[in-house]
Structures are given as C-alpha cells and as structure tokens.
C-alpha cells in the first residue's frame, strides 16, 4: 500500500474505528487484508483512466471521498456500535464496488476485434458475442461508424466504437465486479473463520441494481461469537 493512500485511509473515521477495534482485539490480519485489497483495487482502477479517460474519478480519490461521505452519513454514536465485520465490509466494498470498470485487457481487445482468432478461447468468444449483441442496439452510432469508414474517417469511427465499449463497460460493471472478486479473491475474504467472499461480491453487485434487490439479501452473517455482519446495511450505505 503506497504511503499517500495509507495517509488518506488513516483520515477516514470508518477506518480509524476498524483499526481501533482490530488493535484492541489483536486482529491485525484484518488490517493486513484491507491493505492487500487496497493495493489491488487502486492499481487495477488506474486502467479505468487509461481505457476511459472521461471516468477520471474512479480512482483512490473517489474511494477516499466515498469513505469520507460514509463517515459523515453514519452518526458517530452509531459508528461506535458497528461490529468489526460491518466496518471491514464497508471499507472493502467501497474499494471493490467499481472494480468492474477495469476489465482485463484481453476483454477490451476482444470487444475491439484486435485479437487473432487463435487468441480467442471459449470465454472470449462468448464475450465478443455478448458485446456484438449490445453494439447492435446502438443503431444510429453503428450507421455512423459504417459511413465514416466508407469515407476513410477511421479515427472518428474509432471514437464512436470506443464510446459504445465504454457504455458496455459501464452498464455491465457490477456483473464484472462480482466475477473479478470471484476470480482473484475466492476464499480470501475471511473474517475469523468465516468466508465473506460471496457476501462481498453480492454487496458490490447490488449497488447497480434496483433497491428491491436488497430485499432478497440475507440479513446477517455470523462471523464469530456475538459478532455479525449486517449485509443489507452495508449494501444500503454503499448505494
């Protein structure tokens, strides 16, 4: 975890409360996990600016701003009463909820048809087909692309293609967040002996869904003796 982000994180009242709890209860592994997730999220989110420069706020500043807002949104007396799992999940869901805005490079190349046929495995073929169906819904833009290519205005045509890809990434990012969490963090989001990976993925997915999705969530996850994670609470705050 870089020094700048460490300083920013330490300013968050939510993190301060988590850190206080973990130090008091000798749960340093929880803080270490937050550090690992922070490094992963911040490094990965840098590619958002690379691929979609208009989304400049999906970075560590955006994460810090969200944690600051959450710290103001939750009254101090309520914050003091939150369980350690609640605090932990609030922080890591903020870190990872937009991770789907940063797809693996191979998917972007597949959507742009910039891979050789030999490079397309079953997953990439499926992704290319899903994007192709999505692209067809942008009727006017596709017509403009074809016209510009006929006029040999290739750079202008590519700008429109990039716009459609950006919209696809944005509209599917919560699904992708769940997939990325499953791929890179399966079995690693653990508090005490409780695996919270699936709960984290569900919470991150929920932030882009209708509020009615929250009604389908489990209410609590037992995380140890007299310790519980309130899943809908974290999901509501994240929204």
Q: Where would I find each of the regions flagged by the language model?
A:
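Short, mixed-charge, low-aromatic patches
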Residues: 19-29, 45-50, 132-135
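Short, hydrophobic transmembrane alpha-helix segments
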Residues: 52-53, 74-78
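Alpha-helical repeat scaffolds in large eukaryotic proteins
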Residues: 68-71, 182
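Active-site flanking loop/helix segments enriched in acidic
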Residues: 40-65, 160-164
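C-terminal effector/catalytic modules and regulatory tails appended to multi-domain proteins
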Residues: 1-38, 225-231, 239
């Amino acid at each position: 975890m870089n020094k700048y982000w460490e300083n920013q994180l330490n300013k968050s009242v939510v993190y301060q409360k988590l850190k206080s709890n973990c130090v008091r209860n000798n749960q340093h592994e929880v803080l270490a996990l937050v550090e690992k997730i922070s490094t992963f999220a911040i490094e990965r989110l840098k590619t958002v600016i690379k691929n979609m420069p208009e989304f400049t706020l999906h970075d560590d500043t955006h994460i810090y701003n969200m944690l600051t807002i959450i710290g103001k949104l939750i009254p101090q007396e309520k914050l003091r009463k939150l369980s350690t799992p609640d605090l932990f999940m609030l922080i890591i869901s903020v870190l990872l909820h937009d991770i789907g805005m940063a797809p693996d490079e191979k998917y972007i190349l597949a959507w742009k048809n910039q891979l050789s046929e030999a490079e397309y495995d079953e997953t990439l073929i499926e992704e290319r087909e899903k994007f192709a169906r999505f692209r067809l819904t942008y009727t006017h833009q596709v017509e403009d692309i074809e016209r510009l290519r006929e006029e040999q205005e290739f750079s202008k045509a590519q700008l429109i293609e990039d716009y459609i890809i950006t919209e696809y990434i944005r509209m599917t990012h919560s699904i992708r967040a769940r997939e990325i969490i499953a791929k890179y963090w399966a079995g690693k989001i653990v508090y005490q002996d409780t695996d919270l990976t699936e709960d984290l993925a569900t919470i991150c997915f929920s932030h882009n869904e209708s509020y009615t999705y929250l009604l389908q969530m489990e209410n609590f996850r037992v995380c140890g003796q007299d310790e519980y994670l309130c899943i809908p609470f974290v999901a509501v705050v994240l929204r």
